[in-house]
């Protein structure tokens, strides 16, 4: 009997896919082991070789580390772009047309989809696109971060080493190599995108606008946006149901009633004149009057009232005139100097108040308007 699994891969021997889980691998292994076990097929020497291949395939695929090492070539070959490809394209990008660079970026984009990236990386488009639309594409690509695992870049097969310390050292070296390859790949892709952006022919087709043209363009864009907002508002207003407006009116009415009632209550506050405080109800005022602070302010106010009353009585007694003092000055009505020169003598005379006094009183009067005896002699 010829060996049906000759020159086959582990996945082909166990008849599973590369994304099959351990349960599916075990199920297929048991089925094939029962079918090709030598004890079930005595006298057939080829079954020993077939069964050995089945066991070897199962041992590899059931162990994660062995499976990764076995899949190195498969993982690498499922991607169309490797580090050396990006480096080569970057070195020749100035000599090739833009269409070739755009096609190469599309290969990068497809590789990320295969790697399971959820980022929607855009294409570079063609030369007919406006730079206004192409510029955001480059901005997104310049933040590129690959989802490729680069596990095929591992240097050592850890499972082949029996010494634990050596195996740990191999694992650290493999992790460093994988991390370096990921970082190197990201940097090369970003450099490639940056170079492609600089060489993009669509940059040269940008029309430079003057300040006036730019202002007019912004004004036109603002006008169109306002028009779209206005139409959207009208459409929304048109689709409003009458019931919704009724509910709004009821809510506004109840809100107005509550505000009005609050204004009425607040328009007549209950006030404590001692503490200069407002209260909402009579109960609050009564509780306040029983407080220590109110009683303290009340005692203080009573003391001030008594103090002011005593001072007022004292001032009244000190300002009391003697009984023989004249009630008013003989010249109670004063005449200003300006009136003296502008009014007639008769008018000025009418403003005087004449008081009958004796000659003795006239000559002995004080200096507030009366002549003394020397002045009288001078007049004579």
From Swiss-Prot:
<dbReference type="GO" id="GO:0140506">
    <property type="term" value="F:endoplasmic reticulum-autophagosome adaptor activity"/>
</dbReference>
<keyword id="KW-0479">Metal-binding</keyword>
<dbReference type="InterPro" id="IPR022755">
    <property type="entry name" value="Znf_C2H2_jaz"/>
</dbReference>
<dbReference type="GO" id="GO:0005737">
    <property type="term" value="C:cytoplasm"/>
</dbReference>
<comment type="subunit">
    <text>Interacts (via the AIM motif) with atg8. Interacts (via the FFAT motif) with the vesicle-associated membrane protein-associated protein (VAP) family proteins scs2 and scs22.</text>
</comment>
<keyword id="KW-0597">Phosphoprotein</keyword>
<feature type="region of interest" description="Disordered">
    <location>
        <begin position="307"/>
        <end position="337"/>
    </location>
</feature>
<feature type="short sequence motif" description="AIM">
    <location>
        <begin position="352"/>
        <end position="355"/>
    </location>
</feature>
<dbReference type="InterPro" id="IPR001623">
    <property type="entry name" value="DnaJ_domain"/>
</dbReference>
<dbReference type="GO" id="GO:0003676">
    <property type="term" value="F:nucleic acid binding"/>
</dbReference>
<dbReference type="InterPro" id="IPR003604">
    <property type="entry name" value="Matrin/U1-like-C_Znf_C2H2"/>
</dbReference>
<dbReference type="Pfam" id="PF12171">
    <property type="entry name" value="zf-C2H2_jaz"/>
</dbReference>
<dbReference type="Pfam" id="PF21884">
    <property type="entry name" value="ZUO1-like_ZHD"/>
</dbReference>
<feature type="modified residue" description="Phosphoserine">
    <location>
        <position position="344"/>
    </location>
</feature>
<dbReference type="GO" id="GO:0044804">
    <property type="term" value="P:nucleophagy"/>
</dbReference>
<dbReference type="InterPro" id="IPR054076">
    <property type="entry name" value="ZUO1-like_ZHD"/>
</dbReference>
<feature type="zinc finger region" description="C2H2-type">
    <location>
        <begin position="270"/>
        <end position="294"/>
    </location>
</feature>
<comment type="function">
    <text>Reticulophagy receptor required for autophagosomal sequestration of endoplasmic reticulum (ER) membranes during ER stress. Confers resistance to ER stress by promoting the autophagic degradation of the ER (ER-phagy or reticulophagy). Acts as a bridging molecule to mediate the association between atg8 on the autophagic membrane and the vesicle-associated membrane protein-associated proteins (VAPs) scs2 and scs22 on the ER. May play a role in meiosis.</text>
</comment>
<dbReference type="InterPro" id="IPR051964">
    <property type="entry name" value="Chaperone_stress_response"/>
</dbReference>
<keyword id="KW-0863">Zinc-finger</keyword>
<dbReference type="GO" id="GO:0005783">
    <property type="term" value="C:endoplasmic reticulum"/>
</dbReference>
<dbReference type="GO" id="GO:0061709">
    <property type="term" value="P:reticulophagy"/>
</dbReference>
<dbReference type="GO" id="GO:0008270">
    <property type="term" value="F:zinc ion binding"/>
</dbReference>
<dbReference type="InterPro" id="IPR036869">
    <property type="entry name" value="J_dom_sf"/>
</dbReference>
<keyword id="KW-0862">Zinc</keyword>
<dbReference type="InterPro" id="IPR013087">
    <property type="entry name" value="Znf_C2H2_type"/>
</dbReference>
<dbReference type="Pfam" id="PF00226">
    <property type="entry name" value="DnaJ"/>
</dbReference>
<feature type="domain" description="J">
    <location>
        <begin position="9"/>
        <end position="74"/>
    </location>
</feature>
<dbReference type="InterPro" id="IPR036236">
    <property type="entry name" value="Znf_C2H2_sf"/>
</dbReference>
<feature type="short sequence motif" description="FFAT">
    <location>
        <begin position="361"/>
        <end position="367"/>
    </location>
</feature>
<dbReference type="GO" id="GO:0051321">
    <property type="term" value="P:meiotic cell cycle"/>
</dbReference>
<keyword id="KW-0256">Endoplasmic reticulum</keyword>
<dbReference type="GO" id="GO:0000407">
    <property type="term" value="C:phagophore assembly site"/>
</dbReference>
<protein>
    <recommendedName>
        <fullName>ER-phagy receptor 1</fullName>
    </recommendedName>
</protein>
<keyword id="KW-0469">Meiosis</keyword>
